[in-house]
Regions:
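Alpha-solenoid helical-repeat scaffolds
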Residues: 1-4, 8, 48-56, 72, ...
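Low-complexity, Ser/Thr/Pro/Gly-enriched N-terminal "stalk/linker" regions
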Residues: 1-47
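Extended ligand-binding groove/face enriched in aromatic
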Residues: 40-44, 56, 65-109
Length: 109
């Protein structure tokens, strides 16, 4: 059962992970020698965690915890992190990735 105490612990883990760019597993297809590969540049919204898919899950977890526990003491940190990561520019860059060659590979739409 998810308690407020467990929710706070999960929030702290997710907050640490979404900011951690390395170590990183890269799952994209590089189609040119000068193709961008750095996590923060390639995926400005979802650069943290071990891989892109995990970063998406961590962001989902943070949003879900806010909904389930609106009084969570980590609320301000979660909101600041989501606001910093999920900007219109960052989301547009993520969308552009999916339109590029190789952008619809494993675990991506």
């Amino acid at each position: 059962m998810l308690t407020a105490e467990l929710a706070a612990a999960l929030a702290r883990v997710a907050l640490a992970n979404v900011e951690r760019a390395y170590p990183r597993r890269l799952d994209q297809l590089l189609v040119a020698p000068d193709a961008e590969w750095r996590p923060r540049t390639l995926h400005p919204a979802f650069y943290g965690s071990y891989d892109w898919h995990s970063a998406v899950h961590m962001h989902w977890l943070l949003a879900r915890l806010l909904r389930l526990y609106p009084e969570l003491r980590e609320r301000a940190s979660i909101e600041q992190t989501l606001d910093r990561h999920l900007t219109p520019e960052a989301v547009l860059r993520e969308l552009a990735f999916f339109s590029a060659p190789g952008g619809t590979t494993f675990e991506r739409p």
